[in-house]
Amino acid sequence: MNKMLYIKTYGCQMNVYDSNRMVDLLETQGYNIVANMADASVIILNTCHIREKASEKMYSELGRIKKLQQSRLKAGKSKAKIIVAGCVGQAEGEEIFIREPAVNIIVGPQSYYNLPTMLEKLDSGTENHLIDLDFVEAAKFNKLPEVLKSPTVSGLVSVQEGCDKFCTFCVVPYTRGAEFSRPLEQVYREVLNIAQQGAKEVVLVGQNVSAYHGKDENGKECSLADLIKYVAKIDKIKRIRYITSHPNDMTDQLLSLHATEEKLMPFLHLPVQSGSNKILKLMNRRHTRERYLEIIQQLRELRPDIVISSDIIVGFPGEDDEDFEATLSLAKEAKFGQCYSFKYSQRPGTPAAVKQQISEEVKQHRLSILQAQLMLQQLECNQKLIGKVVPVLFDRDGKYDGQIIGKTPYMQSVCIMNEKDNNLYGKIVNVKILSASASSLFGEVCPNS
């Protein structure tokens, strides 16, 4: 039987991790990953539900897959099996079958470990539509294959899932469930596995990773700082990052680690969402503008070169011009080197969705102003490295022939022209930065690096 797998991933790094694990899981069942959807016998869309456009993208993709199915039939091939995984599957469930009957399987982010069994049922011909949206704590990690089969230079490892914060704009507590942390040793073994396969960097991921509270072998609860220090003992891991954090869970222990653990990179993604205390309260963020800036100041005192990244939502219900100005001023005061900014998107079932909404025109206007400011800030951050030598971990090819791209410790992309006899992939080498744009740095490898 032709077992060819194509997977398309939407959304956050947690989804990227889940997609990698689905590949690991199905490779044990004899599936081979393919780059072209037309060659696949199984197509997985691993979906995101954070914004409305994300779920609509999935339905648009399903429309394209239906046309592809028709072409397969005309060519004498059987239809591919279609799987909707991830947060849209969890949130919309059987409604997806109603809206798009061509879908065969729906699985949530906690239940995809059952895919082999579900695919067997489809193959037997006894079922055509299957769904599994169970929230069974820890079941996923206990039943997935432990050894990863996808060597990467920078590996994602999920350490914590779910969220208990219930921000009024967010669907994560409803699609990913309550906060759950993996045991310390289980995480360590997974990081060790990817290190043995060539990973130089590990990114510890979670919906609220700073709330990590996994237990060690003696049943003692451990913090994210404890986990980072433990993972840092793995010699082959040279760089450690973590994402995404909540300001309320940034403990003094974790903040101090940025000054003492040399493998912990001088970069932190810490979403603020708004600079207005009024809006932060409406969002149920449980922190103030002042507390957020206090954390940033503390980090810079501990690690002066740290680059701060963030998320900001504009046009949240109730946001007026004064609130928006407060957001602009916070972004400037925090000196964000990177920032992801979005228009507020109503998500069904969340408290903010039923409030009086701000017009699309106003939201777009505010977003344009904010993004222009953030672009300048990012350019200024990048330009500070011109003329300096920085260690770069090369992890991917560029879009031009001979170009290779890597990351600085500060999470900036660095582009260089790679000599054919100089294989830089997977290496950390010193690069002199020659120029910068808002999105990238450009440089050359230092001699004898």
From Swiss-Prot:
GO cellular component entries: cytosol
Molecular function per GO: 4 iron, 4 sulfur cluster binding; metal ion binding; N6-isopentenyladenosine methylthiotransferase activity
Annotated positions binding [4Fe-4S] cluster 1: 12, 48, 87
CDD domains (alphabetical): Radical_SAM
Listed PROSITE patterns: MTTASE_N (PS51449), MTTASE_RADICAL (PS01278), RADICAL_SAM (PS51918), TRAM (PS50926)
Recorded superkingdom: Bacteria
InterPro entries: Elp3/MiaA/NifB-like_rSAM, Methylthiotransferase, Methylthiotransferase_CS, Methylthiotransferase_N, Methylthiotransferase_N_sf, MiaB_methiolase, rSAM, rSAM_horseshoe
Family per similarity comment: Belongs to the methylthiotransferase family. MiaB subfamily.
Known function: Catalyzes the methylthiolation of N6-(dimethylallyl)adenosine (i(6)A), leading to the formation of 2-methylthio-N6-(dimethylallyl)adenosine (ms(2)i(6)A) at position 37 in tRNAs that read codons beginning with uridine.
UniProt name for this protein: tRNA-2-methylthio-N(6)-dimethylallyladenosine synthase
Organism: Orientia tsutsugamushi (strain Boryong) (Rickettsia tsutsugamushi)
Lineage: Bacteria, Pseudomonadati, Pseudomonadota, Alphaproteobacteria, Rickettsiales
